[in-house]
Amino acid sequence: MQVIPACNSAAIRSLCPTPESFRNMGWLSVSDAVYSEFIGELATRASNRNYSNEFGLMQPIQEFKAFIESDPVVHQEFIDMFEGIQDSPRNYQELCNMFNDIFRKAPVYGDLGPPVYMIMAKLMNTRAGFSAFTRQRLNLHFKKLFDTWGLFLSSKDSRNVLVADQFDDRHCGWLNERALSAMVKHYNGRAFDEVFLCDKNAPYYGFNSYDDFFNRRFRNRDIDRPVVGGVNNTTLISAACESLSYNVSYDVQSLDTLVFKGETYSLKHLLNNDPFTPQFEHGSILQGFLNVTAYHRWHAPVNGTIVKIINVPGTYFAQAPSTIGDPIPDNDYDPPPYLKSLVYFSNIAARQIMFIEADNKEIGLIFLVFIGMTEISTCEATVSEGQHVNRGDDLGMFHFGGSSFALGLRKDCRAEIVEKFTEPGTVIRINEVVAALKA
């Protein structure tokens, strides 16, 4: 197993995947034509007078719209961010109508990408959008929107997408063979019902809701994602999430600027000014992002004790300032600006921070940051402070979509990051070794 130093000279190694990888991970539409078709159909439904009269705006969307109109600065920002945009949504009123359509449905499997991100992408890429989307009061309204959607996605009414139906030539239910194959792509040819706990003979495979399906459990972890090296080996650090490598950074600074072209972590911001922050200065961070079709639960990376769990309110649609105004390409050479912003996003987005004190003192205190991306805003821990965990134990889960995570090591930690994870586009399998003590 090749490893690299956990801390050498100041270094950031961006492993930003290609647009093709983001597309395969469910974060981009398959083509610009697919995006345009989605926007056109959504705009038609949202502007339909009969539809609007039948359903009306959901209460949190009414409150969101009222907040925009009650604050003169925010209102002007919501005017300015649409300037020059030719496609729908063309104004905040149409945006609210589109929300009203999206939040009444569960996502389907297909060629699109996260639906809210699809309608917000161009707005995020404006100065006015950045200014508005970093406002705390506005983000409280976004949280209300997503909490309301979450209630629906946790209800039995959301199961209508847990079917094998082909809805159109681009989209299908999550139990369609196309979707099932995508969800077990990295499981050595095993079938969905072999890998995950479900009953394929029951309606909806026995899942109680879309969220129940989304947070499916392994049928036998030791077959499909064994704890590599064994649970009793305390010299190893495992992957906490199933993901794709995005960034490795060394000599991470306590306080750093967040506007450089090269993405950078600022520990005080990332860790929400926690008193543990100084211990991680000049340490290292490994970050990955999750496939929309991936396993979305978290597993313990070490044998140790949960010291602290912190829920940090933050932003949902704030793109890195250095990328604002960059072209949104429709080619396979450059990712769109937002998807070049994941390190920045980890510093300011709504997230959960977990500190774990490893039993092995040569590893010591580590941190995990679980980051909700755009509409995927809910992170739920299933462990408590003071609880002891072993490598591979459940820690918690993301809700409702793809997300990102970061693992942080102290400068004095004697563990080193496994070299293969410093290569772009490397699949990180949960429970496999991502760092190990020096031999």
Swiss-Prot record:
Practical applications according to UniProt: The pharmaceutical interesting psilocybin as a treatment option against depression and anxiety is being investigated in advanced clinical trials.
Pfam family, one: PS_Dcarbxylase
UniProt keyword list: Decarboxylase, Lyase
UniProt pathway annotation: Secondary metabolite biosynthesis
The keyword Lyase appears for this protein: yes
InterPro entries: PS_Dcarbxylase, PsiD-like
Annotated GO biological process: phosphatidylethanolamine biosynthetic process; psilocybin biosynthetic process
GO cellular component terms, A-Z: mitochondrion
Single annotated GO MF: L-tryptophan decarboxylase activity
Catalytic activity line of the entry: L-tryptophan + H(+) = tryptamine + CO2
EC number of this enzyme: 4.1.1.105
Functional note: L-tryptophan decarboxylase; part of the gene cluster that mediates the biosynthesis of psilocybin, a psychotropic tryptamine-derived natural product. The first step in the pathway is the decarboxylation of L-tryptophan to tryptamine by the decarboxylase psiD. 4-hydroxy-L-tryptophan is accepted as substrate by psiD as well. The cytochrome P450 monooxygenase psiH then converts tryptamine to 4-hydroxytryptamine. The kinase psiK catalyzes the 4-O-phosphorylation step by converting 4-hydroxytryptamine into norbaeocystin.
Family affiliation: Belongs to the phosphatidylserine decarboxylase family.
Protein name: L-tryptophan decarboxylase
Organism name: Psilocybe cubensis
Gene: psiD
